[in-house]
Amino acid sequence: MENKTPIFFSLSIFLSLLNCALGGNDLLSCLTFNGVRNHTVFSADSDSDFNRFLHLSIQNPLFQNSLISKPSAIILPGSKEELSNTIRCIRKGSWTIRLRSGGHSYEGLSYTSDTPFILIDLMNLNRVSIDLESETAWVESGSTLGELYYAITESSSKLGFTAGWCPTVGTGGHISGGGFGMMSRKYGLAADNVVDAILIDANGAILDRQAMGEDVFWAIRGGGGGVWGAIYAWKIKLLPVPEKVTVFRVTKNVAIDEATSLLHKWQFVAEELEEDFTLSVLGGADEKQVWLTMLGFHFGLKTVAKSTFDLLFPELGLVEEDYLEMSWGESFAYLAGLETVSQLNNRFLKFDERAFKTKVDLTKEPLPSKAFYGLLERLSKEPNGFIALNGFGGQMSKISSDFTPFPHRSGTRLMVEYIVAWNQSEQKKKTEFLDWLEKVYEFMKPFVSKNPRLGYVNHIDLDLGGIDWGNKTVVNNAIEISRSWGESYFLSNYERLIRAKTLIDPNNVFNHPQSIPPMANFDYLEKTLGSDGGEVVI
């Protein structure tokens, strides 16, 4: 894999502080003995290395509050062996483990916990190795989507990958939750295109696909992050792309009635377009007008794109100058608002400094005009709110609902995301913003999926509930308690995920408030595979 310059802490500072902060337990000596030297310890000093690196990958300032729990230490492994040894050393104590890839967990679950915890930050595991002959790549899970896209574009103009468009999202968490993006109508989710993986389990065993078994390999590709162990790397299938694709990003400022009409028609066009096309919408409003930004993507030349939208959606009023031809890599930089492809390789870009909260729905039936009108009406009363709309269809409808844990395939029409964001100066209105979002979500209830109301684990939402794993009474009924959100995210795949969790992590070492629970009273406490700490050589 390509070598990148890792980020290091001062070992001497860590040695002195950890002994004081952690009471002379075994963690320091264990890490040192096993060659894990890149780490720092909790400090209340805002200028310390600890706080600088803690906040470096926090993508939602909502979780930078001084009242939010902080890890006892941050460890940055630089290899799969260091990652394995880190897990083994942490398990000698009583800490909860948190794994952070890009820091985009919508609920901050990759870097917060209600119990004392150690943060394993994967940012130094960000190498990408491209094999053009097999058209595959090994991607370390600390790589961001932008780093992955950049590595692909540097190697080939005819290959790409299907995943999200935000370049600072980590591949570890994104693929673990499925990974929807602008190419999903053509090639499915990111997780649909994973052909192997390396997982470090709770015992520190290093497992490839064969060693972990097909049930666990199935589970890690869409069953949510931070649940099964630590993903060291994904082996992905690279996908054919033309040398030129067509994109557009056009904003229309219109009255609410016209916006309602456009969105009502958009939902049919977005789902029914050929799979070579994607048309998504971002939107917001104020008291005077609605703004709708149309994001279009086509696997081909702009002449075909223009003739298609002229025929199917003339109301957009697109002109030839709106359609831009560029390479696949350039298109993802453009859609992310970047000026150059090389900027994709910068994992520390900050696109928005506002705190935010988001909720999501998936629809099975077309939304009526009154749903769009009511949604826009509510947006007009909250300028800090906005929406993101994505159509499914295409290849998404052809993949079986149990191919991976992500079940929202045939029959799923739209994914509708509701967001509210605010600046630090508006922090006093936080409760007001969250109340507005909850009322929008409640308003949409009659129009979206039911029994259960569907969600997407990469848009994890603790409003749906959570488990206090320290409460033994609750834990004994965890499978039924977790069912409400488990079936919302995974439908009937929830049951298979429970079985996979019981196989790979029966002691529930890797957990968070909405993680998949293992079966209680399992026949053995430590799974046979890797229980002696032995490694499977990859």
Swiss-Prot record:
The keyword Glycoprotein applies. Belongs to the oxygen-dependent FAD-linked oxidoreductase family. It is an enzyme of class 1 (oxidoreductase). Disulfide bonds join 30-89. InterPro entries: BBE (IPR012951), FAD-bd_PCMH (IPR016166), FAD-bd_PCMH-like_sf (IPR036318), FAD-bd_PCMH_sub1 (IPR016167), FAD-bd_PCMH_sub2 (IPR016169), Oxid_FAD_bind_N (IPR006094), Oxy_OxRdtase_FAD_BS (IPR006093). There is a cross-link at residues 104-166 (6-(S-cysteinyl)-8alpha-(pros-histidyl)-FAD (His-Cys)). Its main location: cytoplasm. It comes from Eschscholzia californica. Keywords: Alkaloid metabolism, Cytoplasmic vesicle, Disulfide bond, FAD, Flavoprotein, Glycoprotein, Oxidoreductase, Signal. Essential to the formation of benzophenanthridine alkaloids in the response of plants to pathogenic attack. Catalyzes the stereospecific conversion of the N-methyl moiety of (S)-reticuline into the berberine bridge carbon of (S)-scoulerine. PROSITE patterns: FAD_PCMH, OX2_COVAL_FAD. Pathway: Alkaloid biosynthesis; (S)-scoulerine biosynthesis; (S)-scoulerine from (S)-reticuline: step 1/1. GO terms for biological process: alkaloid metabolic process. GO terms for cellular component: cytoplasmic vesicle. It is found in: Cytoplasmic vesicle. This is Reticuline oxidase. It comes from the Eukaryota. GO terms for molecular function: FAD binding; reticuline oxidase activity. The FAD cofactor is bound via a bicovalent 6-S-cysteinyl, 8alpha-N1-histidyl FAD linkage. Pfam families: BBE, FAD_binding_4. Its EC number is 1.21.3.3. The gene is BBE1. Its cofactor is FAD; a metal cation. Residues 67-241 form the FAD-binding PCMH-type domain. Glycans are attached at residues 38, 423, 471. Binds 1 FAD per subunit in a bicovalent manner.
